[in-house]
Amino acid sequence: MDRGRPAGSPLSASAEPAPLAAAIRDSRPGRTGPGPAGPGGGSRSGSGRPAAANAARERSRVQTLRHAFLELQRTLPSVPPDTKLSKLDVLLLATTYIAHLTRSLQDDAEAPADAGLGALRGDGYLHPVKKWPMRSRLYIGATGQFLKHSVSGEKTNHDNTPTDSQP
């Protein structure tokens, strides 16, 4: 089987295309003689460069993503700086914080004379989380509340709010 093609490709399923593939390989410009060619043989003088470039690009992408998650974690007000969180933990806390801010803005719009500006209303959001085996249980209630409130809030808000979308 040719290592350059997937196992399910039509050319690897029959025996006839093998001579055709060999003829195409041998007719490439720059080929001077018989010998193994393609990914399985021949000299590998230039084949390491694309792999190294791909690896460097992937390392850069992962590093950028890691820095973005750390920055997002730093913006969460209830998470102490020494807390180790997984990416899922950071995303869940960020979504619950955004939901809390959204609900606070909606509550402020409904009752602007409310004296408790910025006070947390105790809805189960913004848990300070340390690494411990049962930390996932913290999110079960918070995300469930978030999903229930956001879905019901969207249904009622679509009927009551004006369609002006500019801030």
UniProtKB/Swiss-Prot annotation:
Gene Ontology biological process terms, A to Z: developmental process; regulation of transcription by RNA polymerase II
Residue ranges occupied by any bHLH domain in the UniProt entry: 49-101
PANTHER family tied to this protein: BASIC HELIX-LOOP-HELIX TRANSCRIPTION FACTOR, TWIST (PTHR23349), TRANSCRIPTION FACTOR 24 (PTHR23349:SF48)
Keywords: DNA-binding, Nucleus, Transcription, Transcription regulation
Biased composition (Low complexity): 1-23, 46-55
Molecular function in Gene Ontology: DNA-binding transcription factor activity, RNA polymerase II-specific; protein dimerization activity; RNA polymerase II transcription regulatory region sequence-specific DNA binding
Any one GO CC term of the record: nucleus
Chain segments carrying region Disordered: 1-60
Species annotation: Homo sapiens (Human)
Gene this protein is translated from: TCF24
Protein name: Transcription factor 24
Family matches, as Pfam families: HLH
Positions with biased composition (Gly residues): 32-45
UniProt-listed InterPro entries: bHLH_dom, E-box_TF_Regulators, HLH_DNA-bd_sf
Quaternary state and interactors: Efficient DNA binding requires dimerization with another bHLH protein.
Subcellular location: Nucleus
Species lineage: Eukaryota, Metazoa, Chordata, Craniata, Vertebrata
